[in-house]
Amino acid sequence: MVNFNQFLKQAQSMQKKMQEAQEQMANARYTGKAGGGLVEVIATGKGEVEKISIDESLLKAEEKEMLEDLIKVAFNDAQQKCDEDSQNSLSGALNGMRLPPGFKMPF
């Protein structure tokens, strides 16, 4: 028979680890790049864009469409890095239990 007090302690420990992982993710920054670094997007762990850097060579009217595409690619790159880190952080808090694909941290 499982010791109920031990079970509660484990649940509280897991909850604390999850809260710590969420705080760590919220404070993390992820840099996405596109076009060999011509466009960089820095996003927070909450998915908010903090900064966009654009190489001056792309600031021409004829480069508008390519610039729009590169910004999108750079943002998606940063978001993918955030998602991977989120999976790893939460999995660590859950003692190695893998999460289902597409599961997001609750924030």
Curated annotation (Swiss-Prot):
Q: Which family does it belong to?
A: Belongs to the YbaB/EbfC family.
Q: What is the lineage of its organism?
A: Bacteria, Pseudomonadati, Pseudomonadota, Alphaproteobacteria, Rickettsiales
GO cellular component annotations, sorted alphabetically?
bacterial nucleoid; cytosol
Keyword Protein biosynthesis part of the UniProt annotation: no
PANTHER family according to UniProt: NUCLEOID-ASSOCIATED PROTEIN YBAB
Q: What is its main location?
A: cytoplasm
Compartments annotated for it: namely: Cytoplasm, Nucleoid
| Gene3D superfamilies with a match to the protein in the record | Nucleoid-associated protein YbaB-like domain (3.30.1310.10)
Role summary: Binds to DNA and alters its conformation. May be involved in regulation of gene expression, nucleoid organization and DNA protection.
Going by the UniProt record, its keywords in alphabetical order are: Cytoplasm, DNA-binding
One Pfam family from the UniProt entry?
YbaB_DNA_bd
KW DNA-binding (keyword) present? yes
Top-level taxon of the source organism? Bacteria
Tell me what this protein is called.
Nucleoid-associated protein RAF_ORF1224
Picking any one GO molecular function of the record gives: DNA binding
Q: How does it assemble?
A: Homodimer.
